[in-house]
Amino acid sequence: MDYCLLLEMAVNLGYELAMAGAETYRVEESIRRVLLTYDLESEVFAIPNCIIVSIETPEGKPMTRMRRVGQHGNDLDAVEWFSSLSRAICNRRPEPKEGISWLTKVNAMRKTYSLGASLLGNFLAAAGFGLFFGGTMADTLWAGILGVMVGLTSHFFASIKTNPFFTTITASFLMAFSAYALSALGLTDSADAAIMGTVMLLVPGLLFTNAMRDIIYGDTNSGVNRIMQVFLVAAGIALGTASAWNTAEMVFGTPADQYILSYSGTIQVLAAAVGCIGFTFVFNVHGHGAPLCILGGALTWAAYLLVTYWGGNDFVANFWAALFAGFFAETMARIRKCPAISYLVISLLPLIPGGGIYRAVNFAVRGNMTMFADTAIHTAAVAGILAVGILMASTSVRLVNLWKTQHK
């Protein structure tokens, strides 16, 4: 057997998973299982920007392969495809050359949305969450249009390979300044609602979720790496929106505090569902998985509202809703034999504190440092509570699976 080709096949599979946005443990476990199928023990080390794999052939010859992982996106469909390929290789044990051919075919077969469809997703995501955060119909429409602006900005900078931090700052500035300009012209009722809805497109939901799951599975280096990326993106959003507020103040005068509407639970759940529909385009979800992701997002917010109805505070409601989202994702993953991350990311979106990030920045630029500190601490605490909910759901499922394995 050509062990060089075998190692190349395994590393390339891990690389494709990493580029699609898979968790570190999934990348490492997929490589390890593929090599074990060929009776090879391996040492696999992966972090978000690098994969290193070492094996020893039956003749005692050590071999190591390293591959750098560049900037990667949010392609949940690719995570499903390559996870399925990993299982197929483990079940059928093809020759390495044939396995590499399978990898090439999967790359050619997997689907991606066109730019137009992606922009439609941006519109729906921003519009849905604009309504979710209490905007009027006018705010919702403008949030959708600003979402398209963010999509075009991100697409342009990605095409010229600009640093993501700069892209986030620029997109945040253009979006927020446009919202303040629309408010000054009397075209929106609440620039804040439109901005909060659109900011959800920039909030690193997949990064945050993967960071928590990496830490859960003991991949602390990767988890901390991703958490730092989350902080950088949040800082980029803060810099962009703060600069937009200051610029708008010079051009139009101080942006007024605007009233945010309070909708019924039913409308909030429907708005969350619309936002999640948009994110199925943003995260490249196809087929039967898309409606299940949307259902997960709607039910997660319904769970949040139910806990608050029973008297739970914001932290308690976020914990139970995150726990529900975790169990929902794990259940769907086992029913459909797909990675749980495909369902968890979108199911969690209504809980991701994008609005909290914007409110904290807004208080800071207005000089209300007491409210800034309170809101920033609350937002960080919510993120921590979500992590605990995800941790408990994932750990519970792993313990149940371990018990079943031991008692077969």
What are these regions (language model features)?
Residues M1-S101, N107:
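Soluble N-terminal domains of membrane-associated systems
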